[in-house]
Amino acid sequence: MRITGTTAAEIAGSVRDQVASGELAPRASLPPVRVLAGELGVNRNTVALAYRRLVEAGVAETRGRGGTVVAAVPQLAREGVGAGVEGDCVDLASGNPDPLLLPDLLGAARRGEYSPPLYGAPAVDPELDTWARADFAEDIDQPFRTLVTHGAVDATERLLNAHLTRGDLVAIEDPCFLASIGTLRLGGYRSAPVRVDGAGMRPDALRAALAAGARAVVCTPRAHNPTGASLTEERAADLRAILARHPQVLVIEDDHFSAVSARPYHRVTPPGSTRWALVRSVSKFLGPDLRLALVAADAGTTARLEARLSAGTTWVSRLLQHTARELLLDPRVHELHERARELYARRSGLLVERLRAQGIEVPYRPDGLNVWVELDVDGRAAVADLARRGWAVRPGHLFAPDPAAHQGAIRVTAATLTEPQAEAFAAELAATVAELHSTAT
């Protein structure tokens, strides 16, 4: 191993080259900061900065007194995977929608007229495009173009890849959607965590992230996962004013719960923004297996995405688009969405009420599938004790850009929660907290 360089960028690049060539294997230890600084004749802070960039890019990881080592393939948490649901545990961990509130995909695929396209055919179903344009036009008051991607995560990855390079800083919510953490780590981007409260991203935290050099912002306007927070009109205006001072920053709004959200959409993208996209996945209200998201974006951003989703290469299956179109145009599906909106709001609200009755405060009424509960005990210990009692939930640290954060929180998926379950779970969580308090004294 021969690390070279006199600047943080050069040192980090040297390590990356050796990792790519295989000279530095996963879990190989990097020299201590003091030792490498002496060998290279540079300040210790220069080496420390290089190592920090390697960690932020997912190339290396820190192990406390064990030093800094080359990272193995990232083991990233995902929705529904590794959620700790075993045996007879009640699943409040998966993050999934209620299957009974999803329409029949196979029936929709068989309806209407469908002609299998050949190479060179339009990449987007014309009728789906017409529907999407009308839907977006209700919320966007600036020129836009539409296209279809393989889901919201695919859209976010492609948008970041189209505008950013490895090592660029991206402002993301804290806590945030699991896939956002994975997208940044796998893409080699650095994260600038922006704290979230009941009204969404906090203006002071966004301002700090932009001052630190964030080149993109990923924001959830409503039904934020994991907290259930939604932007208020006032908060959206504050964020819009801040972003207006940074017109070149890429703004991605992930409106994943649009059709079944109980909250209105409040736009954070300012009129003068030159690079932006509004992404609306259909997974939460048409089904996770319908890998499709509708995207509205400025002309330049759309052109960059189209180059990566052109007919004949990586376009979204027209059969999937046909299925989505049939469902989105079906009045019966609209009625199902109205019912889903009502039931999801009722279930999450019921859980909040039952928790409050047990002395566990959730400071705002969430929207979406999940409820974020902050506790005054260790979240992992609470998750383990709840599992022993027959309840599966997810620990808060999984949703933090910095895994050391949100150690005292849990996320509870309330999508299928019944009233008896809400009552029982709240009592069990209160018992768990009391038991953990007693063992700590």
Task: State where each predicted segment sits.
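N-terminal basic, amphipathic alpha-helical segments
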Residues: 1-118, 130, 134, 310-317, ...
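Short glycine-rich anion-binding loops that position phosphate/pyrophosphate groups of nucleotides
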Residues: 97, 222-224, 284, 417
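Short strand-turn motif at the edge of the Rossmann-like AdoMet-binding core
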Residues: 222, 255-257, 282
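Residue-level detector of anion-binding/catalytic polar loops
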Residues: 169, 190, 250, 361, ...
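Hydrophobic residues in beta-strands of the RecA-like P-loop NTPase core, especially within AAA+ ATPase
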Residues: 172, 253-254
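PLP-dependent aminotransferase class I/II
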Residues: 278-356, 362-363
